[in-house]
C-alpha cells in the first residue's frame, strides 16, 4: 500500500533534520477523517496555554478564559442586540461572557448574577480554565468539541497523518462567532466539499483522472446552499471574508457561516468572523435550517488547502505565494493562523507536506522538529524552514505539493506508531505530548 523511509540531513551548523517519506500507489485509498472529541483534548489545550503559549507570547497575551460546554447543557437561540440571532450555543455563552465579565487587577468581575452562576457551573465541571499573559485584557476563548487524538482513533489503520490548520490562539478569535478548534481550509473527497476554502490560499488538487496541480480555489467560485436556497457571489449575494474585509455593509442582512454551519443571522454592519465568512444579501433571507452545503468541485477526487505551496511543477517554492497574517501590520484584520512564522528562509519548525511525484502518485513527508523543551542540538532534529522543506521535497522527486499543518500538530502514524518525535514536550520530564487535532488523512 505504501513505503516509508527515514532520511537524515545535516545543516551547515551541524544541526540535523530527520525526514520521514511515505510513497503510495494511488489516491483512492486516502480519506479524510475527524477524530472523536476526547475530554483530555480540552485539558491538554489548557495546559499548552498555561505552560507554553502565555509564556512565549506573554506580551501579546492577556488573561485567556478558555471554556467548553458539557453536552447536557441546553441553551436557547438568543437574539442579541449587537450580534444578531445566535444559533450556536458556544456563541451564546461567548456573547454572555464578553458582555458581562470584566478584568480588574487580574480579577474577574461579573456584571450580573446569571453570568456568574453559569461561569461557576462550568468551572465546577472542569469546563473553564484561565491562563494569564502580561496584557490587562480579557480574551474569551470558546473551545469547540471538534478535536481529538490521532493515536486514539482507527488504531488498526495502516497510516494516519494530521491535515488542517485550526484556530488555536487568542488572536485567532476575532469575534463572538469564532471558537478554538475550528478547522481552516478546503477539504474535498471524491467531489464532496467537506470544509470550505478560506483566504484564497493555494490548494493541492487531484482530479478524477489522477492528475495533480497546485491552484487557487475561492469561496467566490463555489455554489453555497442552505436548504433549497443557492447563493453565488456576484449573483444574489456578496461573499465576504478576511483579510479583504473587516465589516459587512450597513445595509442588508448577514448570514454568518463557519465551516458547514450558519452560526448567526443579523442585519448588516457587523464584524466578519476570522474563521468563517459572511453571506451578505439585500433581501431578507429564508433560513429553513443552519446546515450549509457547497458545490462546484465535483470533478475533484481529492483536494486540500493549508499552508504555502512547497513544490509546483517540480520547482521548489522560494517565497510566500499564499497570504498569512503579519503581526507587524495591525491595520490588516487578523485571520488564522495569526502566529504563523513569516521568515520563509530561516524560521524552522516541524513540517508536514503532502504532494505527488512525477507520476502523480502520493507522497507525504514529515519533517521532525525541535522539542519545545529539552532540545539537544545535533541529537534531535531542529526543524526545517519553508525554503529548506521545499528544496528537500523537490530533491526527493516531488512534482506538486503543499504544506499541511505543522508545528506541534505534525505527526505520521504507521500501524499507530510514530517513527519520529513530536515537538510538544512536557516541561519537566521532556516526554512527548501528542497534540489533539481537528482532522487527519487515513489509509486503512
Question: At which residue positions do the language-model features occur?
Answer:
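Zymogen propeptides
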Residues: 1-273
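Short, surface-exposed loop/turn motifs at beta-strand boundaries within globular domains
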Residues: 14-17, 303, 347-349
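N-terminal nucleophile
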Residues: 62, 129, 310, 351, ...
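Conserved, well-ordered active-site substructure
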Residues: 170-198, 202, 206, 317-321, ...
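A short "linker-to-beta-strand initiation" element
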Residues: 210-239, 294-329
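Short catalytic-site patches enriched in acidic/histidine residues
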Residues: 263, 269-276, 309, 316-319
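A generic structural motif
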Residues: 275-281, 409
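Short nucleic-acid-contacting surface segments enriched for D/E, G, S/T with interspersed K/R
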Residues: 284-292
Amino acid at each position: 500500500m505504501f513505503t516509508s523511509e527515514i532520511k537524515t540531513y545535516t545543516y551547515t551548523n551541524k544541526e540535523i533534520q530527520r525526514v520521514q517519506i511515505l510513497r503510495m500507489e494511488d489516491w483512492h485509498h486516502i480519506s479524510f477523517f475527524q477524530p472523536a472529541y476526547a475530554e483530555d483534548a480540552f485539558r491538554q489545550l489548557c495546559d499548552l496555554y498555561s505552560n507554553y503559549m502565555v509564556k512565549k507570547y506573554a506580551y501579546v497575551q492577556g488573561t485567556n478564559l478558555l471554556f467548553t460546554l458539557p453536552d447536557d447543557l441546553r441553551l436557547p437561540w438568543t437574539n442579541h442586540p449587537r450580534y444578531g440571532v445566535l444559533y450556536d450555543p458556544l456563541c451564546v455563552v461567548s456573547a454572555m461572557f464578553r458582555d458581562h465579565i470584566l478584568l480588574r487587577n487580574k480579577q474577574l468581575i461579573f456584571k450580573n448574577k446569571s453570568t456568574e452562576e453559569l461561569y461557576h457551573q462550568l468551572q465546577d465541571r472542569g469546563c473553564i480554565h484561565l491562563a494569564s499573559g502580561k496584557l490587562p485584557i480579557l480574551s474569551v476563548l470558546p473551545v469547540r468539541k471538534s478535536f481529538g487524538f490521532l493515536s486514539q482513533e482507527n488504531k488498526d489503520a495502516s497510516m494516519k497523518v494530521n491535515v488542517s490548520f485550526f484556530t488555536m490562539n487568542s488572536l485567532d478569535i476575532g469575534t463572538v462567532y469564532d471558537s478554538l478548534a475550528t478547522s481552516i481550509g478546503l477539504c474535498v473527497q471524491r467531489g464532496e466539499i467537506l470544509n470550505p476554502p478560506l483566504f484564497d490560499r493555494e490548494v493541492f488538487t487531484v482530479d478524477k483522472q489522477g492528475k495533480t496541480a497546485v491552484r487557487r480555489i475561492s469561496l467566490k467560485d463555489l455554489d453555497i446552499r442552505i436548504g433549497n436556497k443557492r447563493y453565488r457571489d456576484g449573483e444574489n449575494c456578496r461573499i465576504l471574508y478576511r483579510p479583504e474585509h473587516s465589516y459587512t455593509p450597513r445595509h442588508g442582512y448577514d448570514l454568518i457561516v463557519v465551516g458547514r454551519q450558519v452560526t448567526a443571522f443579523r442585519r448588516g454592519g457587523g464584524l466578519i468572523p476570522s474563521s468563517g465568512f459572511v453571506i451578505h444579501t439585500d433581501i431578507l433571507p429564508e433560513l429553513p435550517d443552519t446546515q450549509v452545503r457547497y458545490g462546484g468541485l465535483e470533478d475533484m477526487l481529492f483536494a486540500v488547502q493549508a499552508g504555502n505551496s512547497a513544490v509546483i511543477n517540480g520547482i521548489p517554492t522560494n517565497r510566500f505565494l499564499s497570504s498569512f497574517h503579519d503581526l507587524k501590520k495591525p491595520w490588516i484584520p487578523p485571520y488564522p493562523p495569526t502566529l504563523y512564522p513569516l521568515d520563509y528562509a530561516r524560521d524552522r519548525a516541524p513540517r508536514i507536506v503532502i504532494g505527488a511525484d512525477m507520476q502523480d502518485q502520493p507522497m507525504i513527508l514529515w519533517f521532525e522538529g525541535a522539542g519545545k523543551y529539552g532540545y539537544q542540538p545535533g541529537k534531535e532534529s531542529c526543524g526545517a524552514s519553508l525554503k529548506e522543506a521545499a528544496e528537500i521535497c523537490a530533491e526527493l522527486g516531488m512534482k506538486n505539493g503543499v504544506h499541511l499543518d505543522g508545528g506541534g500538530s505534525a505527526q505520521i502514524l504507521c500501524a499507530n506508531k510514530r517513527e519520529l518525535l513530536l515537538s510538544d514536550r512536557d516541561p519537566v520530564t521532556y516526554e512527548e505530548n501528542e497534540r489533539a487535532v481537528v482532522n487527519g488523512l487515513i489509509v486503512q
